[in-house]
């Protein structure tokens, strides 16, 4: 058996109670006589919103329950109940077995073998006093008052906080036994002011892996980030629109990370490959510049600094690192045990479920372009006429690899130097074409603090990368 217990911590009584469920889950899974995964799963979210000094929302939500997933004669059966009693566990297991009997069968092939993942991975703090609800409100009031006093020209100022923690105990008939609790903080500051031609806004996301004490305890640091955000907003209000058409650009790490996830990562998920993804018939082919190596990683990513952590997936498979593209060549896809068997690959721990009532799907974990050795100044200096895009907003990509994303912060590049700030624009293209155009890859890997993915179920992910120089289609004014 593989022992993945990388983060053992003294447990509080509630944690000990959840960890103590593992032997019961394991005993029932192993006594089932078929491939079985039993999971207790709880998600807790605290959210706060303040606008113009008025607290609009301050709430806590929690969902928890038990699920059973059975694989029998080539078909899965799944059942879930919002209860964690022994009786609920038996009922869920029985219903899952019944559902497996009723499911359509395309064949009776087995699941790909996988070593059982084991370990305790509780990342919640035990060494410091927690912020109380009242202290969180007071922090918001302090920040809002400071913003209002320093920047009276703002027409709106919004503060949004989300504290999220996913906690689960999982055991399988194959011997996997694992408990995890992974917290994350997302703090958004959005500012707007009036320019000559209308309202201009800009936001920044802070936080990441851990709890509020890890990210929001230093008010001076937060205010410094807000000062930088205001400076960017002021320049943007006086900024220029992009020229439309194909352009040489530098994508900062925030934009490169989203593209790695949305435009490339999804095309390499094996269920979408089977559905006709553009990546499906390109294994072993060059799909990117030799400077591009792109992977999906377990743990907290290759540098241990992602905003998300995962060591064992929801099928009980240990999370191994996967290089999807290596030096420009497409090497493999992301799998669960079912698609790994169908496509002759090894599962690496990509089966994930967002809530107790969700069945695991093939999902990304920590997806990023690995850093190179090209300084940012060299990228900018290599462009005569183009743009430096720093922050991406909403966007979309499809199975053909075509993408379009909004960009809300950037600068002109003229004769190898940064010029005017930019207004909102869009970038679009085909992912593999864009990656083939990459000529520079920066040396610094950074991660979005707020990565989420919405493939049927929302789920936390890590999205990262260095800055890259490439060519994309830019929206704007001719």
Question: What residue spans do the PLM features occupy?
Answer:
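N-terminal small-residue-enriched
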Residues: 1-478
